Amino acid sequence: MARIAGVDIPREKRIVISLTYIYGIGKTKAQEILKAANVSEETRTRDLTEDELNRIREAIDGIKVEGDLRREVSLNIKRLIEIGAYRGIRHRRSLPVRGQNTKNNSRTRKGPRRTVANKKK
């Protein structure tokens, strides 16, 4: 397995797909990286030369990926919570942040249902 940005990428897949195993790189970003590194998208990871791998690594060095990106996202969320922004409050309460309805749906964000007991009459 080739190791790029601290991640072992699969050998048998096309390089454009293999790069998406790195957090922060999707298919479009992978295509841009390969274009900048002058490497064909159809090449399998196992067929890459050391020179091509180094060019890909150099192209990725300019992009925030993996740990740096995860840290930035978590710091952004922490900042929203600290300043008391509406989005920060939604994060703190584990509710949807982007304005979705919560009466019936949003189970992914809220977690399993917690049944509320009825008052005795």
Curated annotation (Swiss-Prot):
A Pfam family per the record: Ribosomal_S13
What keywords were assigned to this record?
Ribonucleoprotein, Ribosomal protein, RNA-binding, rRNA-binding, tRNA-binding
One Gene Ontology term, aspect cellular component: small ribosomal subunit
Under the heading InterPro entries, the entry gives: Rbsml_uS13_C, Ribosomal_uS13, Ribosomal_uS13-like_H2TH, Ribosomal_uS13_bac-type, Ribosomal_uS13_CS
Gene3D superfamilies documented for this protein: 1.10.8.50, 30s ribosomal protein s13, domain 2
Disulphide bond pairs: none
Sequence ranges of Basic residues compositional bias? 106-121
Q: Which GO terms describe its biological process?
A: translation
Q: What ranges does the record give for the region Disordered, renumbered to this chain? A: 94-121
Recorded GO MF terms: rRNA binding; structural constituent of ribosome; tRNA binding
HAMAP family in UniProt: Ribosomal_uS13
Q: What does this protein do?
A: Located at the top of the head of the 30S subunit, it contacts several helices of the 16S rRNA. In the 70S ribosome it contacts the 23S rRNA (bridge B1a) and protein L5 of the 50S subunit (bridge B1b), connecting the 2 subunits; these bridges are implicated in subunit movement. Contacts the tRNAs in the A and P-sites.
> What family does this chain come from, according to its entry?
Belongs to the universal ribosomal protein uS13 family.
| Subunit relationships | Part of the 30S ribosomal subunit. Forms a loose heterodimer with protein S19. Forms two bridges to the 50S subunit in the 70S ribosome.
Classification via NCBIfam families? uS13_bact
Name of this protein: Small ribosomal subunit protein uS13
Q: Which organism is it from?
A: Exiguobacterium sp. (strain ATCC BAA-1283 / AT1b)
